[in-house]
From Swiss-Prot:
One of its GO terms (biological process) is DNA-templated transcription. The RNAP catalytic core consists of 2 alpha, 1 beta, 1 beta' and 1 omega subunit. When a sigma factor is associated with the core the holoenzyme is formed, which can initiate transcription. The gene is rpoZ. One of its GO terms (cellular component) is DNA-directed RNA polymerase complex. GO terms for molecular function: DNA binding; DNA-directed RNA polymerase activity. SUPFAM superfamilies: RPB6/omega subunit-like (SSF63562). It comes from Streptomyces griseus subsp. griseus (strain JCM 4626 / CBS 651.72 / NBRC 13350 / KCC S-0626 / ISP 5235). Belongs to the RNA polymerase subunit omega family. It comes from the Bacteria. This is DNA-directed RNA polymerase subunit omega. It is an enzyme of class 2 (transferase).
Amino acid sequence: MSSSITTPEGIINPPIDELLEATDSKYSLVIYAAKRARQINAYYSQLGEGLLEYVGPLVDTHVHEKPLSIALREINAGLLTSEAIEGPAQ
């Protein structure tokens, strides 16, 4: 029996080289993805409470897919924008 259901590929897809095109550095990518993953996790947590403060996943997700994998796929698809935070004025 063959299955046409695609399985999530986790952290290996999308490739790091493609993800780095969306940010300035690996550090920026990590922060960017972590913040979005926290938003996705908070969205799933608040679903049962009826609150809709956060935006849910912008890509199709799989049942057991981790928020970080979802965030990386959103970044790779160009669905998110980031803004640089300026440091304190000197």
